[in-house]
């Protein structure tokens, strides 16, 4: 098939804060033999390449350097305002606005590309990517493409902290353009990240073999190893991401069915314990003490079912104790350390932490007494 007969494919290279996040590849609905919304698709394609030069607002007609200015979880991520960066600007290659072509395509699934507008016939450059089906937008917004790769990046943006629906950290399109040749052909291929992880961040977005308990266990086991690799290389945040991703896949099928191997259930429970406990370890290192406390608690809750070894239970108690200490809850920390010591008698790390916690309690009591004396003097 000649290149001109194929649907255009374009890309966004995304940066979150100062960190590269990766590439989102999109396919546009514009075919000579299926001419659905050619004008809308051409507008987006040209704004990706920047080939139209400068617009009427004396700004480059290009998405390069613009941000995703509006993000609503379980709805969509929105960008394309390359003039004001806040949802009030942007313009099309045809002028400030152009009419709705048609509403033939529906918002019936996540990862669809659709035009943002401020009412009928007000299409400019702003667009959004759905993260769930949004049928209430049918007949109001023009769908003209879809994400074909980089869905994990869309999910990462969707789940970012926001203030008044704007990400608290800038999500920038640092480069964009049209794909051709080998890049076009490879646009749909899932590329492994630096750890070797080829899987989508969320099971709902998984493509390939059908998910079941055995497949999810296999993927979660691999993700544990990817997390270990990241942690050993010094990337604590990435390691934590992999452990949490593994739990998402395990939670997709929390219990095997009757046709699965008999040893699958205990293996799944053991893996769940490990992923929670490892998550607690890394969260402590990142100063996420409340999360670390919760994940250690989850590990201890499944310890019996997972048939966890005493040494591993001791680690979970120790990690929760560190989390309590980080939140200045020394009394709770001391209780957990004493439980850990019962399971791992004489452990130097536990004994050192007990000494630190007891000193913190003693120092706190001394401060309280000094404050009381000063108050009554």
From Swiss-Prot:
This is Peptidyl-prolyl cis-trans isomerase D. It comes from the Eukaryota. Disulfide bonds: none annotated. The gene is cpr6. Residues 11-178 form the PPIase cyclophilin-type domain. It catalyses: [protein]-peptidylproline (omega=180) = [protein]-peptidylproline (omega=0). Keywords: Cytoplasm, Isomerase, Repeat, Rotamase, TPR repeat. One of its GO terms (cellular component) is cytoplasm. It comes from Aspergillus fumigatus (strain ATCC MYA-4609 / CBS 101355 / FGSC A1100 / Af293).
């Amino acid at each position: 098939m000649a290149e001109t007969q194929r649907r255009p494919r374009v890309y966004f290279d995304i940066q979150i804060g100062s960190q590269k996040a990766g590439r989102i590849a999109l396919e546009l609905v514009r075919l000579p033999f299926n001419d659905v919304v050619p004008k809308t698709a051409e507008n987006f394609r040209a704004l990706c390449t920047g080939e139209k030069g400068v617009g009427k607002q004396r700004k480059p007609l290009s998405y390069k350097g613009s941000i995703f200015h509006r993000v609503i979880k379980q709805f969509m991520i929105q960008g394309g305002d390359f003039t004001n960066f806040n949802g009030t600007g942007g313009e099309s290659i045809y002028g400030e606005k152009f009419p709705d072509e048609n509403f033939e395509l529906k918002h019936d699934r996540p990862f669809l590309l659709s035009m943002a507008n401020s009412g009928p016939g007000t299409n400019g450059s702003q667009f959004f990517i759905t993260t769930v089906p949004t049928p209430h937008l049918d007949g109001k917004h023009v769908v003209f493409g879809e994400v074909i790769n980089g869905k994990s990046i869309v999910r990462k943006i969707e789940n970012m902290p926001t203030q008044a629906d704007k990400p608290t950290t800038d999500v920038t399109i640092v480069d964009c353009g049209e794909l051709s040749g080998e890049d076009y052909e490879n646009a749909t291929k899932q590329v492994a990240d630096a750890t070797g992880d080829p899987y989508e961040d969320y099971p709902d977005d998984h493509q390939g073999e059908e998910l079941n308990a055995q497949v999810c266990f296999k993927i979660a086991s691999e993700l544990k190893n990817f997390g270990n690799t990241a942690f050993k290389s010094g990337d604590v945040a990435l390691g934590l991401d992999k452990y949490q991703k593994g739990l998402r896949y395990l939670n997709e099928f929390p219990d095997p069915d009757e046709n699965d191997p008999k040893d699958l259930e205990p293996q799944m429970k053991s893996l769940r314990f490990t992923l929670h406990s490892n998550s607690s370890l890394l969260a402590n290192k990142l100063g996420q003490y409340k999360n670390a406390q919760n994940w250690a608690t989850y590990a201890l809750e499944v310890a019996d079912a997972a048939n966890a070894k005493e040494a591993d239970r001791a680690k979970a108690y120790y990690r929760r104790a560190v989390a309590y200490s980080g939140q200045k809850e020394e009394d709770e920390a001391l209780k957990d350390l004493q439980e850990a010591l019962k399971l791992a008698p004489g452990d130097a790390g536990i004994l050192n932490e007990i000494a630190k916690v007891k000193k913190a309690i003693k120092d706190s009591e001394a401060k309280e007494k000094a404050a009381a004396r000063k108050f009554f003097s």
